[in-house]
Swiss-Prot record:
Protein's membrane topology: Multi-pass membrane protein
Species for this entry: Avahi occidentalis (Western woolly lemur)
GO BP terms, alphabetized: ATP synthesis coupled electron transport
Primary location: mitochondrion
Any Gene Ontology CC annotation: mitochondrial inner membrane
Name of the protein: NADH-ubiquinone oxidoreductase chain 4L
Annotated TM spans: 2-22, 29-49, 61-81
Subunit structure: Core subunit of respiratory chain NADH dehydrogenase (Complex I) which is composed of 45 different subunits.
Family of this protein: Belongs to the complex I subunit 4L family.
EC numbers: 7.1.1.2
MF terms in GO: NADH dehydrogenase (ubiquinone) activity
Keyword Membrane (UniProt): yes
Function: Core subunit of the mitochondrial membrane respiratory chain NADH dehydrogenase (Complex I) which catalyzes electron transfer from NADH through the respiratory chain, using ubiquinone as an electron acceptor. Part of the enzyme membrane arm which is embedded in the lipid bilayer and involved in proton translocation.
Length: 98
């Protein structure tokens, strides 16, 4: 396995570990999710370019579209929670309340 694949997989694992460690803050979770999506984008692009798969050139672009949608929804949720409660702690929120 080339070293760049190892670096990308290590970046994904680090972002996933960050999601597990910093799951009490919404902003930290969103940043770690963005890191995971970026490493998945780089990994899928490298695999497609190394395998010369001309059929699936659209897959990394589709992944970026979903990452942008996830970021927009996450930031909207962060703004809503910050305006409503004044903090971004996930453990203090109860989404079952009206």
């Amino acid at each position: 396995m080339p070293p760049i694949f190892t670096n990308v997989i290590l970046a994904f694992a680090t972002a996933f570990l960050g999601t597990l460690i910093f799951r009490s803050h919404l902003m930290s979770s969103l940043l770690c999710l963005e890191g995971m999506m970026l490493s998945l984008f780089i990994l899928s692009t490298l695999i497609i370019l190394n395998m010369h798969l001309t059929v699936s050139f659209m897959m990394p672009i589709l992944l970026l579209v979903f990452a942008a949608c996830e970021a927009a929804i996450g930031l909207a949720l962060l703004v809503m929670v910050s305006n409503t409660y004044g903090l971004d702690h996930i453990k203090n929120l109860n989404l079952l309340q009206c």
